Amino acid sequence: YFIDRPMGFLYTPDLSKAPQLPEIKKSQLFADFGWATMRTSWEKDATMLAVKSGHTWNHSHADANSFIIFHKGVDIIKDAGNCWYPNPSYRNYFFQSEAHNVVLFNGKGQSREQQYHGSMLRGYLHYLLDADNVKYVLANGTGPYSDQFSRNFRHFLWIDDVIYMIDDLKTHDVGHFEWLWHPGGEAEKRGIDLNITNGNSSVVVRLLYPRLLAKSD
């Protein structure tokens, strides 16, 4: 019925000639809205790293330099969650930096006023590289954090099965940093590692600097 009508190509597309997997690039930088994605393949159980650093306002959360990782069909490192807009938890938590995988300084992320007034200076993504087993992208979140940071760079270097995340940070004042990670599965600390497991998907998080995780008792 729909095939012979103008909207038919949307509701009943002919997929008989479509390739089994998309014949497009595995890495892409969407500079205008501040997203970059890198993946091992287009298979369903592939690994994908997605990085965000762009504008902050309204639907665009306070998550400059944040990232998520999908592995074997599971968002194994993810945002904290979501809720509907009228719920006070949306504006008080889920929109804010604390609900994302970012670095806090003295317990604070991006200014909470950016939700309704926007960030005067946006974040950026640069230098996307995909050489198959070596991938790279730089996230520059200095702008949205400029009330606290004079430099907020996050380098993502993906070599084979290891993703190195290097934070280059400089703040206006003396204080302490806090790294936020939101696991998408059971998290267990084993020695200097944090193991996150969800079904057949798992990831090992190891902090190298400024210090290792303390060994478990």
Predicted regions and their residues:
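CBM-like, beta-strand-rich accessory domains located in the C-terminal region of large
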Residues: 1-2, 83-217
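Carbohydrate-active enzyme catalytic cores, enriched for enzymes
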Residues: 1-77, 130-134, 138
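Short helix/loop capping segments that flank catalytic or ligand/cofactor-binding pockets
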Residues: 46-49, 59-60, 77-79, 86-87, ...
